[in-house]
Amino acid sequence: MSVASQDVVLADLTVVIPVRNAARLLPECLASVSREGPSQIVVVDGNSIDGTLDIARQYPTIILSDGGRGLPVARMLGVQAAKTRYVALIDADVVLPEGSLARLLDEFTAGGYAALQAGLHSVGGPGYWGRALAQHHRSGRSKNWFGVVATIFERETLLTVGFDHKFVSGEDIELRWRLAQGGRRIGVSTRTIVTHRFDGDSFSFARDQFAMDGRGLAAMVRKHGWRGARLLALPAAAAVRGVLLSLARLQPQWLPYYVCFAVGNYLAMIDTLAGRPRKAES
């Protein structure tokens, strides 16, 4: 794609970035997004108290508030505010390599996709849990699963299908389910790769990641019944695969991680399916 045609296409794309206390991650994310030159950058804040808004104001952004109502609401507020045909949902923990947004949009339009996510290269901190999370995401099958970390949609698709606001996590899985059920083409790019950063390097951070995954899978079962029940096996399958790969690669240091991953997922699933209230987030 020529530079001129890139400019024309990106002029019809809005980037939506939902944020909540993302001051550590947002500067590099916004710098990379701004460099790409989309028509609009919409930052939707969830009652941040750490300087996130001050950072957002340093860039040519439209700033909205979701009132702390969560990611599904934040993303849809951004989509509704967009004035362009295409919308890219970019999380604050993503950094876009130069030219990646135009390449992803070119692949999206050429392939007739309803939604296309960039491939993810995950990185973590230098400690055990940061490295473990990153290696799991780089080596696990989930890296090829469609999500909304760095994903382009037709704006009209999101306005029509949208997110289920009742989901506090796993809304990406639920959206993927409904898009696929509706016969829409979705995918993950193998040509355009972006950096995905874990903003934590502690056991408590990893535990929260596991809990969010488990709650999301359980919420799918609660909504979709037996059709979603097979999702309950995913953490066990991922843990077994991770253990076997760790042993085969002579990397036993990751075994505790996969045990904690499975236990954390299933404890959160049980709480969600039992209807127990989750702890309020800080």
Give the ranges of each region predicted by the language model.
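Non-catalytic, C-terminal membrane-associated alpha-helical segments of glycosyltransferases
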Residues: D208-G216, R222-S282
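Active-site donor/metal-binding and catalytic loop motifs
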Residues: S189-R207, G216-M220
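Short aromatic/hydrophobic "clamp" motif used to bind/position activated sugar donors
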Residues: V87
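Short, well-formed alpha-helical segments that are part of the catalytic scaffolds
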Residues: N21-R35
